[in-house]
Amino acid sequence: MTPGLDRARALLKRTRRVAVLTGAGMSAESGVPTFRDAQTGLWSQFDPMQLACEEGFRADPALVWRWYAWRRALVAEAKPNAGHRALAAARDKLSLITQNVDGLHVRAGSTHALELHGNILRSKCLSNCGKRFDTPEELPQGEPPRCLTCGDWLRPDVVWFGELLDPRILAAAESAAEDCDLMLVVGTSGLVYPAAGLPARAARRNAPVVIINPNESDLDDGADLVIRSTAALALPALFD
């Protein structure tokens, strides 16, 4: 058995409220490339930071929409892995927070996942009318569709560079971290805030923090237990 897994199982058995934070490493196991790994082929000549921002979208809506359409196609080919399914099976026992925008947790059955950075399979109005839609097909000329309410462009329903997280989702995630008896941190580098600050919120309330990651992360030093394994291997064993 993976070192540390027995101890994690013992911690899990005596807790009532579990919070789970997942990151890009979990989706990578399903074949979803990380944000920068997605810059291949035609798109390797573009800076992703210029495509994932409002300024870039306003400068060339068709280009940015095509990039996201390509990324959506990659996501559509991916399937939830054993780690996603394990969390979905235990969904009534935990609060699930994810940095991933691929919707794999929801597809696995975790219908109440808190998607901190949005969902690439949804669109929202570029203006402040607030309407959200399942992403429609692009127009023949490759331009993004228009909002059915106000007529402005639709944009991906994800958090772009320079934007704040949805305050309601962030508040719910912070509450889950502060109220939990145990926090699992799965497949995240710990570099992106405010998500990376959630484990510290749990630790300040004396909740053990357990990291599941085959690679080192910036959160390792503050964790009570680090399990060097992948989500697809460790989570089914942990929640068995």
Region spans (language model):
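Conserved catalytic core of sirtuin-type NAD+-dependent deacylases
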Residues: M1-D240
